[in-house]
Design a protein with these regions (language model features):
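Flavin-dependent oxidoreductase catalytic cores
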Residues: 1-169
C-alpha cells in the first residue's frame, strides 16, 4: 500500500479514530469495525481509540476507564492492537486493561499533569529495583521504592480483608 511504501515496516503506523460520536444515529460499532479492518489491511499497526469531539450534539457517558470498552471491541473483533485512554489514573487500572487484553497500550494525560512522578511511583509499586532507574534519580527515589513496596503490601492485605466472603473461594 502507499502507506507502507512511504513508511517501511520498521516505522510503526498509528491512527487515531473516534469510536463513537455519542450522537443519536451517529457512528455505529459496525462503522468502527469496518474502518478498523480497512486500516489494518493497508498496513496500520495500531489504532489509538478515542471517542467524541466530532459533533456539537454529543452526549458522552464518561467515567473511570470509560473508553476501554471501545478499545476492547476493536482489538478483539478487528484483531488489531489498540491504544486506550479515558480517566485511567493508577497502575492497577493499567494492569487490568493490559492483562485482560482490552488494549495493548494505555495513554496517560491528566495523571501525568497531576503527578509528574506517576511512572516512577508505578515502578516502585510494581517492585522494580533501584538499579532499574537512572543513576541521577537514585538518591532521591530509592527511599520511595521501599516506601511504595510497604504501602502496596499494606493495601493488598487490606483488600484481602475487605473482600466479600462470596469472592474468597
Amino acid at each position: 500500500t502507499a502507506i507502507r511504501e512511504t513508511f517501511t515496516s520498521e516505522k510503526p503506523i498509528s491512527v487515531r479514530i473516534s469510536a463513537t460520536d455519542w450522537a443519536e444515529n451517529g457512528i455505529t460499532e459496525e462503522d468502527v469495525l469496518y474502518i478498523s479492518s480497512v486500516f489494518k489491511s493497508v498496513g496500520v499497526d495500531i489504532i489509538n481509540v478515542s471517542t467524541g469531539n466530532t459533533v456539537s450534539n454529543e452526549a458522552p457517558k464518561t467515567g473511570r476507564m470509560w473508553q476501554v470498552p471501545f478499545s476492547d471491541t476493536i482489538k478483539n473483533t478487528a484483531q488489531i492492537p489498540t491504544i486506550t485512554a479515558g480517566i485511567i489514573t493508577d497502575i492497577d487500572q493499567i494492569n487490568t486493561i493490559i492483562l485482560n487484553g482490552k488494549a495493548d497500550l494505555v495513554a496517560l494525560g491528566k495523571p501525568l499533569l497531576l503527578d509528574p512522578y506517576f511512572v516512577r511511583k508505578a515502578q516502585a509499586y510494581e517492585n522494580f529495583e533501584v538499579k532499574d532507574i537512572p543513576k541521577s534519580y537514585e538518591r532521591g527515589i530509592a527511599p520511595l521504592y521501599s516506601l511504595q513496596q510497604t504501602e502496596r503490601k499494606q493495601l493488598e492485605k487490606m483488600k484481602r480483608k475487605l473482600k466479600p466472603k462470596s469472592n474468597k473461594n
